[in-house]
Amino acid sequence: MKGLLAGTIAAATFAVASAGEYCGQWDWAKSTQYTVYNNLWNKNAAASGSQCTGVDKISGSTIGWHTSYTWTGGAATEVKSYSNAALIFSPKQIKNIKTIPTKMKYSYSHSSGTFVADVSYDLFTSSTATGKNEYEIMIWLAAYGGAGPISSTGKAIATVTIGSNSFKLYKGPNGSTTVFSFVATKTITNFTADLQKFLTYLVNSQGLPSSQYLITLEAGTEPFVGTNAKMTVSSYSAAVN
């Protein structure tokens, strides 16, 4: 595919990707604006399974991609992977961000049986442009099969409306990182938003320092368990202004 590089994190050289899929734990494909990761970071939590990801199209700032997997056995409450499209951008302090426009349209299919997964944006911030993750902000568009976010209490700390969508907000620790998770009250498969509004809410209402740098912006799916599952993102775009 023209304009796309493929490889692994450890690879020393890259090759132009074909329209095929990549299935290695840390495989990825890269365009000028996005890196699409397979990212099977917790595959050993499953008794068996595999996952493959592929980029379908690139048109300007919009990308289309998909990921297919089967994860069975093991802990049904543990995420196995996070196949995602990560925006390539320079870190920027929240107080200096004007807008974070994004669009994401997707569909999800799976075989009968237990299926647990979420579809989510994942943002990380740090006190410096090159620092470690201090805050994680997740925006869940879907929580399939009872998937639940990190939470100290198991209960939402607030219900907020951002744009035209309602979300329940959860808070909890992941090691030394404070995690805020906005979980949509109903599944959203065609999402258009300014993600800066989520950050502004957290700054104004939940104590997120506006001096934090946004260092990562990703969107994808976290599967817990599922057979012959496939998420197809027909169009995705994001920018940090």
Swiss-Prot record:
One of its GO terms (biological process) is polysaccharide catabolic process. Glycans are attached at N174, N190. It catalyses: xyloglucan + H2O = xyloglucan oligosaccharides. The keyword Signal applies. InterPro entries: ConA-like_dom_sf, GH11/12, GH12. The active site is at E136, E222. The xyloglucanase activity is inhibited by the binding of the host apoplastic glucanase inhibitor GIP2. GO terms for molecular function: cellulase activity; xyloglucan-specific endo-beta-1,4-glucanase activity. It comes from the Eukaryota. Keywords: Carbohydrate metabolism, Glycoprotein, Glycosidase, Hydrolase, Polysaccharide degradation, Signal, Virulence. It is an enzyme of class 3 (hydrolase). Residues 1-19 form the signal peptide. The keyword Lipoprotein does not apply. Its EC number is 3.2.1.151. PANTHER family: BLR1656 PROTEIN (PTHR34002), XYLOGLUCAN-SPECIFIC ENDO-BETA-1,4-GLUCANASE A (PTHR34002:SF9). Glycoside hydrolase that exhibits xyloglucanase activity. Acts as an important virulence factor during P.parasitica infection of its host Nicotiana benthamiana. Also acts as a pathogen-associated molecular pattern (PAMP) in host species, where it can trigger defense responses including cell death. The PAMP activity is independent of its xyloglucanase activity. With paralog XLP1, is required to elevate apoplastic sugar during P.parasitica infection. Interacts with host apoplastic glucanase inhibitor GIP2. Belongs to the glycosyl hydrolase 12 (cellulase H) family. This is Xyloglucan-specific endo-beta-1,4-glucanase 1. It comes from Phytophthora nicotianae (strain INRA-310).
